[in-house]
């Protein structure tokens, strides 16, 4: 195969784009930014992203997809109150919105029309922040080579959040207006108003910290799920197994946290160590059991009552 010989490209992410190919002859352009859907290889040539996402990539996308859903459920529960019977319908609607947004996002991504995406493999943290690695050969002129080296893991999250927001604005107000009769006019839409705040926050979080989240999300899941489970059981004054079994809602919350524990463990293990670390899944119920066995020594109900009385 004949390839035109040109000087090597500067910078980590500058590459040469294929201009012409005729049989075994390939002609590449000057060093610059790679087109969307391509990234540089070791020889500094822009190559299309043709690989399938790894299991860890899918788990990361699943984590980013869960964030708005969990926040929806939290604010729905927060603003619905104990007297409202509309919370369940709103929970189901939020799940439907996020599920449909995920399906639509996959369908509009390359290749279009199938529930499959092609991607470039993440090699290091700097792949998420190519804008920080634009070379300046003479320390005056900057060669701009910013592109999505982790295609499409960075932008697909923004697309998903956009569809989540659109579907929420189309479906949720009609549902809330029709069934949330137990709430006041000023309260029934507060969960929607909350989403209008946390979606921009999630967008900025992905834009600035997407690479950090990619490597840290398994540990974030484990820590947050442990903390929130302890806080929930303490606030609900659960001190023994009977308190846990007396209400179905508490069991649902417990099993949801167990699923998050398992999700975090599998994410940390990755696919290359999954078989070795599968026995760790047996530890999923351990935090809840530890809490139940030690609750009698801390007496969460007494602590809550003293806090409410200002002591």
Curated annotation (Swiss-Prot):
The chain crosses the membrane at residues 58-78, 88-108, 150-170, 189-209, 211-231, 251-271, 278-298. Residues 1-57, 109-149, 210, 272-277 are lumenal. Induction: Basal expression under nonstress conditions; expression increases transiently after endoplasmic reticulum (ER) stress. GO terms for molecular function: ubiquitin protein ligase binding. It is a multi-pass membrane protein. InterPro entries: JAMP. Pfam families: JAMP (PF05571). Residues 79-87, 171-188, 232-250, 299-311 are cytoplasmic. The keyword Transmembrane helix applies. Ubiquitinated by RNF5 via 'Lys-63'-linked ubiquitin linkage in a UBE2N-dependent manner. Ubiquitination decreases association with components of the proteasome and ERAD. It is found in: Endoplasmic reticulum membrane. GO terms for cellular component: endoplasmic reticulum membrane. GO terms for biological process: ERAD pathway; response to unfolded protein. Glycans are attached at residue 22. Keywords: Endoplasmic reticulum, Glycoprotein, Membrane, Transmembrane, Transmembrane helix, Ubl conjugation, Unfolded protein response. Elevated expression in medulloblastomas. Patients with cancer had 2 to 12-fold higher frequencies of antibodies against this antigen. Regulates the duration of MAPK8 activity in response to various stress stimuli. Facilitates degradation of misfolded endoplasmic reticulum (ER) proteins through the recruitment of components of the proteasome and endoplasmic reticulum-associated degradation (ERAD) system. Interacts with RNF5 and MAPK8, but not with MAPK9. Binding to MAPK8 occurs before and after exposure to stress, such as UV irradiation. After exposure to stress, interacts with phosphorylated MAPK8. Competes with DUSP10 for MAPK8 binding. Associates with multiple components of the proteasome and with ERAD regulatory proteins including AMFR/GP78, CANX, PSMC1, PSMC2, PSMC3/TBP1, PSMC5, PSMC6, PSMD8, SEC61-ALPHA and UFD1. Interacts with DERL1 (in the presence of misfolded protein CFTR(F508del)). This is JNK1/MAPK8-associated membrane protein.
């Amino acid at each position: 195969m004949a390839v035109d010989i040109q000087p090597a490209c500067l910078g980590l992410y500058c590459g040469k784009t294929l201009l012409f190919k005729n049989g075994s002859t390939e002609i590449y352009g000057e060093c610059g930014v790679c087109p969307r859907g391509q990234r540089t290889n070791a020889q500094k040539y822009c190559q299309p992203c043709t690989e399938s996402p790894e299991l860890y990539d899918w788990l990361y996308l699943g984590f980013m997809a869960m964030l708005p859903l969990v926040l929806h459920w939290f604010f729905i529960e927060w603003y619905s109150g104990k007297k409202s019977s509309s919370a369940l319908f709103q929970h189901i609607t939020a799940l439907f919105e996020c599920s449909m947004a995920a399906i639509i996002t996959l369908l509009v991504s390359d290749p279009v029309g199938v529930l499959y995406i092609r991607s470039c493999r993440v090699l290091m943290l700097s792949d998420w922040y190519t804008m920080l690695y634009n070379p300046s050969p003479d320390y005056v002129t900057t060669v701009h080579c910013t592109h999505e080296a982790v295609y499409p893991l960075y932008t697909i999250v923004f697309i998903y959040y956009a569809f989540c927001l659109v579907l929420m604005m189309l479906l949720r107000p009609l549902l809330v207006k029709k069934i949330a009769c137990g709430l006041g006019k000023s309260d029934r839409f507060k969960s929607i108003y909350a989403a209008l705040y946390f979606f921009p926050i999630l967008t900025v979080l992905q834009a600035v910290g997407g690479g950090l989240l990619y490597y840290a999300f398994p540990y974030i899941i484990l820590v947050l799920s442990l903390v929130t489970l302890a806080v929930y059981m303490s606030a609900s004054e659960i001190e023994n197994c009977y308190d846990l079994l007396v209400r179905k809602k508490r069991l649902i919350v417990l099993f949801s946290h167990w699923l998050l524990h398992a999700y975090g463990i599998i994410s940390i293990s990755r696919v290359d160590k999954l078989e070795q670390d599968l026995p760790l899944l047996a530890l999923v119920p351990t935090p809840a059991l530890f809490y139940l066995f030690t609750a009698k020594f801390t007496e969460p109900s007494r602590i809550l009552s003293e806090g409410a009385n200002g002591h």
